């Protein structure tokens, strides 16, 4: 049995990983362990990649799982607009590494202002929408889209994409 370890105990990230494994019809054991990302609570731009990779590396070290998976949400200024997205990074114990990026979405100036004052996106969302701990539920994307797209949905596709070299190799003996 293949064991995949997620570098988080956030229920949204765990459920998104479960859904991705279900979509792929992979009967892997999933464990979620909180590990350090090595980046700020609210990473910007390239630090999002660093945080996701660090989570994957750290969780595979702590658990000795077959696959380490890190998910890190971040914010970046692109052409004068702040966008949010997530990076999903996978590492196997054999050293294969891959990553994928979620869809991105622009943030309203009210959120950007709070983020630039030191709040993380989840905190900014909670303040503006008068919610609590939205990062473990629908997330900023869910609040902004009236749950047409929620945080779990945002993560499933990049998890599938980050894992493709691993499950294709296991299923089809495709060399990567």
From Swiss-Prot:
UniProt-annotated binding residues for Mg(2+): 36
Keyword list, A-Z: Hydrolase, Magnesium, Manganese, Metal-binding, Nucleotide metabolism, Nucleotide-binding
GO molecular function: ITPase activity; metal ion binding; nucleotide binding; ribonucleoside triphosphate phosphatase activity
Catalytic activity of the protein: XTP + H2O = XDP + phosphate + H(+); ITP + H2O = IDP + phosphate + H(+)
A Pfam family hit: NTPase_I-T
Recorded coiled-coil stretches: none
Cofactor notes: Binds 1 divalent metal cation per subunit; can use either Mg(2+) or Mn(2+).
Cofactor(s) in the UniProt record: Mg(2+); Mn(2+)
GO biological process: nucleotide metabolic process; thiamine metabolic process
UniProt record similarity statement: Belongs to the YjjX NTPase family.
PANTHER family per record: NON-CANONICAL PURINE NTP PHOSPHATASE_PRRC1 DOMAIN-CONTAINING PROTEIN, PTHR34699
Assembly and interaction partners: Homodimer.
Function as written in the Swiss-Prot or TrEMBL entry: Phosphatase that hydrolyzes non-canonical purine nucleotides such as XTP and ITP to their respective diphosphate derivatives. Probably excludes non-canonical purines from DNA/RNA precursor pool, thus preventing their incorporation into DNA/RNA and avoiding chromosomal lesions.
Protein's name in the database: Probable inosine/xanthosine triphosphatase
Organism: Saccharolobus islandicus (strain M.16.27)
Top-level taxonomy: Archaea, Thermoproteota, Thermoprotei, Sulfolobales, Sulfolobaceae
């Amino acid at each position: 049995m293949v064991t995949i370890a997620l570098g988080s105990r956030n229920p949204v990230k765990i459920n998104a990983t479960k859904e991705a494994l279900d979509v792929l019809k992979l009967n892997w054991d999933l464990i979620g362990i909180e590990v350090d990302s090595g980046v700020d609570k609210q990473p910007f731009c390239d630090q999002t990649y660093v945080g996701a990779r660090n989570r994957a590396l750290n969780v595979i070290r702590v658990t000795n799982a077959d696959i380490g998976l890190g998910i890190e949400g971040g914010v970046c200024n692109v052409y004068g607009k702040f966008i949010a997205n997530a990076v999903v990074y996978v590492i196997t114990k054999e050293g294969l590494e891959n990553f994928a990026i979620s869809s991105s979405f622009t943030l309203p100036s009210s959120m950007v202002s709070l983020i630039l004052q030191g709040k993380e996106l989840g905190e900014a969302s909670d303040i503006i929408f008068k919610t609590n701990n939205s990062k473990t539920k629908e997330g900023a994307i869910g609040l902004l889209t009236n749950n047409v797209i929620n945080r779990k949905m945002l993560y499933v596709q990049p998890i599938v994409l980050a894992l493709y070299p691993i499950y294709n190799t296991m299923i089809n003996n495709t060399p990567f």
